[in-house]
Amino acid sequence: MSSIESLSIQGIRSFGTYADDLQSIKFSSPVTLILGENGCGKTTVVECLKYALTGECPPGSDRGKSFVHDPKIFGLNEVLAQIKMQVRDRRGAQVSICRTMKVSKKRNKMSFETMDSTINFLTGAGQSKREKQDSLSGRSVDIDVAISDFMGVSKAIINNVLFCHQEDSSWPLDESKKLKEKFDAIFGITEYNKALDKIIKLRKEAMEELKIKEANIKHVAYLKQEMEVKTLNLQKAQRKCDAIKAQCSECEEEMKPIEARLVEIRNVEFEIGKYQAQKVEMDTKHKNCKDQISTLTLKIKKPFRGTLDELDQEISNFDQRMLEMRQKRTEVEGDLSQIKRSSVAEQEKLGTQDRKHCLAKQRHQSELACRAQLLKRVKEFCRELHIPIDCDLVEQPEKMGEVLRDIEAMIITKHCEITEIVEQNEKADRSRQVKIDELRIELTKSEQSVTAQEKQRESSKRESETLGVEIKKIETSMQDLKKLEKEINEVNELYESATKNIDQQAIKDAIARKKASIAENQIQFKKLDEQLTFLGSMAKLVAECSLKQKELDKKNQEVHRVRSRHSDHFGKLFKEPITCNYRRSMQVVYEKLRREIQELNEKANTQKLKEQSYEIKRKNLISDISRMEKELKDSEELIYQKCRSTPYDDLLERSKTTISKLQFDHGALKSSEALYKKYIQKMDEEPSCPLCHHNMTSDEACDLTSELTDEIQKLPDNITRAEKALKAEQIKYENLLQLKPTILKVKELKDSLPQKKEELKKVEELLGDSVSEYETLIALIGEPTHNMELANSMMGDMSLLDEALKDSARLTKDLDLQKGQLPASYDSSVSMDDLQAEKSKVSKELETERKELESAQNAVQQQMDALNRLREKKNSLKDRQIHLREGLQSLPQLKERLEKLNSFLTTVASEISELKAKIQPLKLNLRAAIEEKERLKKSESEKLAQLNSKYNSYKSTDHDIQRLNKEAEDYAKLDLRNEIKKLDEIIMASKDKLRKLEAEISLKTDELETIKTECSNQQTVERDLKDNRELKQLEDKEAKLRESCQVLDKQLGNLDFHSVSKEKVNLTKQRDKATVRKGELLGQLGEIHSQVNKLQREIDEPRFKESLKNFRKANYEIEVTRLCIEDLGQYRLALEWALIQFHSEKMEMINRLIREYWRKIYRGNDIDYIQVKTDEVSSDASADRRKTYNYRVVQSKNYSEIEMRGRCSAGQRVLASLIIRLALAETFSSNCGVLALDEPTTNLDRANINSLCEALNCIVEERQSQSNFMLIIITHDENFVSSLGKITSYHRVFRNEECKSVIRRVEAGPSKKALIDQ
């Protein structure tokens, strides 16, 4: 059973929004009492419980805007609110529910927004976390549905029964429509009604669907028969197709060796072309190699006469010499960089020493200033403290320590004086506080005595009022007693007259007559049943005749249907009308059409073979043209890539000219270095121009020399660029030479392509004529083919028609035989249906008489019940008479108790007056003592503050002096004068070392320049050696190329190109013959394929392909639909019966509880009982209607039930609503034992309040054994609280000084109340 454990509220209505405003309440079993004044926030607790469980805002809150704390109160733009609730679900596991809301103020408009709703699963009661989940969020699931599931009750019960809002608490006496909605929601009738409507709708749809399926199955059966015929024809065509395919495979096998040999011949042709291309390439390379050899021979100044190995050795020796010179250059550069690094390091060292020297001088100045400031501060502080100084501290600095110790001793003395004053002040203050505490204790005792006396007076006063009311009631009951005796006499007279008016003998005679009439009808019913049994014995033979007749009518209809369907086709296929042997006549027509089509097909196939031969020739020509055009396009693209738009011969000549020019430029650059050096040498000897011999000034000569030197330095790069350009141009020239065969091939293709295209044009003309003639033949085949297909499609119906005619004749004969077997005594005018109708009529009369008998018996029973009720009323009146007499007997004791209470109240009033007179002087004395204590304490504090201020200034000055003394001692330890002298010596040594290093750098630089000049002079020799090596390599390459050309000539001679070409022509003729034969077979195969495809397409149509499956499926669906209709009818009846039974049982239980609670609680005598009346709405009693109910609350007055709405007082309305809610909670909330009552005493008088308390106490005692039972009562009536029995604690709701709602738990005891924070 689920229950509530705790609730936390923040930012709801008058509850504050800040963290310290959070209010919590822990609910206890069996009763949780919440007490508070009007408007302090009691009802807000119920609203929060309801909102946490259902997510619905309370009524009148403007969709939640006034439910959250108003932001206008504290001048905020938005307010966040949160409700946290911890519960135990119906399985006992702990669940935490948290709902967060926000109200924002934008442009003076308020908007409410739900921020988040979360369920957290806690562990508890032996339950693990639910399905390994920690929490559920409102973004992923419906939180309200989940909470209803956890609590074990529906949302309607939570809203309307368990946590009903005070404004909606009187809903049981609301208007009829709203009351019906509430009860339907509580019973869950709405969902069940939806299920019933769904079942009714499904049953109707199934019945309509059954009619449609029964009509459609005839068409499905016809398609199944058509499918079987077409499948047989398809299998014959496929067997013929397989035979032709085998012949085609034989042709392909004959062509395979021919094709293989043709592939080999093409490979030989490819090899010949490849060797020819290689030969052209080798010739080109050989010629280029010779040209390069001649060019290099001209460039070399000094040819090398040895071998290539000797030349490599010479180059290696030269490289060794150059390597030694480079190594020496690297060593000199390394030494120079090492010396430079040493110089830089020495300069950095000198800079570091300079910085240290400056820092030492600054510290020395700071030391002198610190010592001067220390002496000044010490002298001033000693004068302030009156400490004498006997020596000069400048000349004797060692005396400084003694002076500082004297200062420290004087400061400690001042601190001791302040401590003594503080102790004296505290002692005086404690004595004054003792006096104040004594006065306060005396005052508290007096006030507590007054409070206790007032409480005792109040309780006595309440008891006195209660006794007065009881005495008045007993005095007035004397008159009631007389009325009661009169009423008892009246009831006795009514009972006696009712007994006389009932004639039991007459009633028994009427019942006997009814029973005799029922017996006569039963005899007639039995006679009719025997007649039906006789007809039933003949029913089989009659039924067979009827079935035969129906079958005969069906066959005649089928014959008429088939004849009507094909009446137009009969006129088209037959010249004369036919009446029998339809299938045989149709087969004759079919064979005639087949022979005609076969003749036309043979002519068409002959023409098709011609067409295919032309088509093959055309495809071969197109293939050759495409291949030649592709080769032409590729060759032209290759030529374009190499030559662009320039003619090939012009480009070849231009490339050759460019190579010659580049070779000349390369040679000129190689020789220009020696020429420039010669010019420079001459200008050094005589400053004049080497060309015009013009005398130049020294500056002009120097500029020209520099310019020529720069040109010499650029020569290696210029030579490298010239060599790259020359090699690139040579490669281009070689590529152009390789392009020569492609040029020749393009010319050949351009000559042969027009011839091929002309041949293709002639073949296409012949192909067009052949296609036209073939199409004409195919068109002629169309009409007989259509007629043959029509005859073929009608063949099945003709078989059915012949079969139907035979069946019709057979059924006519069988029907005549069966009619002759019927007996002569059989009366055909008397049908079984008439007897069955008469039997039903007698059965209804029997049922009517039985109902009349039952109503008569019920009337007798009602009369007896009326007598019993009168007897019960008489007994209850006598019980009440006895109770009133007992009250009259206790009247003297009550009056005596009232007099004692009045005298006690007088005594207590005088004692309270005396105690209040003593309290005022005690308050004045206490206030005077407190003021005197505060005045003296303030004066002492001011004096002490002055002393402390002076002491703190002494302490600060002493701290500064100690700091200066510490700094002076630290400076003395550094010995700064000697440090400055050492740094001066180090700086002078570093400067001397730097001068030596600069001299070494100058020497090494000159040596490096000499080595660089020697290296540049060796480059000319290196170039000559490399040219000799390149010449040797080219000579070897030329010899190899010459050998390769000879080998290619020999290979081309070995390939017999003429015999290969002749063999290719013969094989091509053989292949063409086989292709023609294969074409003929393919033509036949195509025709058969068209038939197969046509049949396959027809079979693959959904109506034929799925015909068998659809036929079976249709039968299954019809049977299943019938069963579904029967099952849905049974399900609907079962569900409605269960609903009616559930509703009646629950309403009976609810009304029983309502009567029981009303008699316990209500103390009036005008209403005997109340109950919820259920009225069934009248509707047509069809299978597709469901029952609905209306609800109303009625009251019984003088044994007459009248509607309570509009006929009861405000108190009766409240009490009736409360009792109905109690009964509903007892009935429907078996899984949740929580019930909240908000202000249950509203509009109730004291008697009904007391009886309500007694009833609630009884409910609590009965349910106390259930640990999860919880009754939450919210009230402002403290007398109601005191009447609820043993309440050990309750929760008080009040407003604090900020007008925010606060919840405190109050322990209720006999003499004290303590507030305990939650």
Curated annotation (Swiss-Prot):
How changing S623N affects the protein? In strain: NC336, NC358, NC361, NC362 and NC375
Xref: SUPFAM superfamilies: P-loop containing nucleoside triphosphate hydrolases, Rad50 coiled-coil Zn hook
* Domain comment, as recorded: The zinc-hook, which separates the large intramolecular coiled coil regions, contains 2 Cys residues that coordinate one molecule of zinc with the help of the 2 Cys residues of the zinc-hook of another RAD50 molecule, thereby forming a V-shaped homodimer. The two heads of the homodimer, which constitute the ATP-binding domain, interact with the MRE11 homodimer.
Keywords, sorted A to Z: ATP-binding, Cell cycle, Chromosome, Coiled coil, DNA damage, DNA repair, Hydrolase, Magnesium, Meiosis, Metal-binding, Nucleotide-binding, Nucleus, Telomere, Zinc
At the top level of its lineage, which domain of life is listed?
A: Eukaryota
Q: What remark does the entry make about the cofactor?
A: Binds 1 zinc ion per homodimer.
Q: What is the effect of changing A246E?
A: In strain: MW25
Q: Which species is listed as the source? A: Drosophila melanogaster (Fruit fly)
Its annotated function is as follows: Component of the MRN complex, which plays a central role in double-strand break (DSB) repair, DNA recombination, maintenance of telomere integrity and meiosis. The MRN complex is involved in the repair of DNA double-strand breaks (DSBs) via homologous recombination (HR), an error-free mechanism which primarily occurs during S and G2 phases. The complex (1) mediates the end resection of damaged DNA, which generates proper single-stranded DNA, a key initial steps in HR, and is (2) required for the recruitment of other repair factors and efficient activation of ATM and ATR upon DNA damage.
The name of this protein is DNA repair protein RAD50
Q: Where is this region: Disordered?
A: 447-466
Q: Which GO terms describe its biological process?
A: chromosome organization; chromosome organization involved in meiotic cell cycle; DNA repair; double-strand break repair; protein localization; telomere maintenance; telomere maintenance via recombination; telomere maintenance via telomerase
- Result when mutating S249M: In strain: MW25
Q: What is its EC number?
A: 3.6.-.-
Entry's family note: Belongs to the SMC family. RAD50 subfamily.
Q: What is the effect of changing V220E?
A: In strain: NC335, NC362 and NC390
Q: Which Pfam families match?
A: AAA_23, Rad50_zn_hook, SbcC_Walker_B
User: Outcome of mutating T657A, per the record?
Assistant: In strain: MW6, NC357, NC358, NC361, NC362, NC375 and NC397
Q: Where does ATP bind?
A: R13, N38, G39, G41, K42, T43, T44, V68, D70, Q166
Q: What happens when the gene is disrupted?
A: Death during pupal stage, possibly due to the accumulation of DNA DSBs and the induction of apoptosis in third instar larvae.
